[in-house]
Design a protein with these regions (language model features):
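Catalytic core and acceptor-binding pocket of nucleotide-sugar-dependent glycosyltransferases
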Residues: 120-123, 141-145, 149-180
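Conserved donor NDP-sugar-binding/catalytic core segment of glycosyltransferases
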Residues: 106, 130-141, 145
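Active-site-proximal specificity loops/subdomain of glycosyltransferases
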Residues: 16-22, 52-106
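Short, solvent-exposed loop/turn segments at secondary-structure junctions
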Residues: 11-15, 55-58, 78-81, 116-120, ...
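Short beta-strand-to-loop acidic/aromatic patch adjacent to the donor-nucleotide binding site
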Residues: 107-119
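N-proximal low-complexity "stem/linker" segments adjacent to membrane-targeting elements
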Residues: 1-35
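Acidic donor-binding/catalytic loop of UDP-sugar-dependent glycosyltransferases
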Residues: 116-130
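Short loop->beta transition adjacent to catalytic acidic/histidine clusters or analogous donor-positioning motifs
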Residues: 3, 41-50, 70
């Protein structure tokens, strides 16, 4: 079983970070990309992938790792991390929101977002996600963190509702970080 579209964000830099992160920086760089693609191609088998690039100084050459068609949208500037961003939305939220709109404009029935540092595993993950979306409009992963946005899915109704709610938040991501 395959899906029509997987979306993700992208930012990589050789410079030290000026914000707090969890995990090894190796998962945020080009060196991790072949592993990411192997998990996405093996367990989701998308017909298309959208990468929203936050004006990253280091680019991944996606075609070196996959035969899946990739569309890339590059932001004019890096919105930054929620801890130090200067715009209303941080880079992660820009990637999520732009890819949601992209999915709606392309009439995609199943929206899947996989963060650039997340691995997907399990032959039944796509079927289980589709089944869950028959009961709910949004499906998020499970784990130790309060918020699980590394992998999530939505149907069209869920996309419209979620985008509407996100756009109604008057506080910037720096004021109220989306991770918390």
């Amino acid at each position: 079983m395959s899906c029509e579209l997987v979306t993700t964000g992208w930012f990589a830099s050789d410079q030290p970070r000026n914000y707090r992160t969890a995990g090894d920086d190796a998962i945020r760089g080009v060196g991790f990309r072949p592993v990411w693609w192997q998990s996405v191609d093996t367990f989701l088998a998308p017909r298309h992938v959208l990468v929203v690039d936050s004006a990253s100084p280091v680019k991944a050459k996606e075609s070196e790792f996959t035969a899946t068609p990739v569309e890339r949208i590059e932001l004019l500037m890096n919105p930054g991390h929620s801890q130090n961003g200067t715009t209303h939305y941080c880079g992660a939220m820009a990637a999520i929101m732009l890819s949601m709109e992209y999915a709606l404009f392309n009439d995609v029935d199943l929206f899947l977002y996989v963060e650039q540092d997340a691995l997907i595993h399990g032959k039944a993950i796509l079927d289980r996600t589709k089944n869950a979306l028959r009961r709910r409009d949004l499906v998020f992963g499970r784990g130790d963190m309060d918020i699980q946005q590394s992998f999530f899915a939505a149907n069209k109704k869920g996309l419209r509702r979620f985008l509407s709610a996100l756009h109604s938040i008057n506080y910037s991501d720096k004021q109220i970080a989306p991770e918390y």
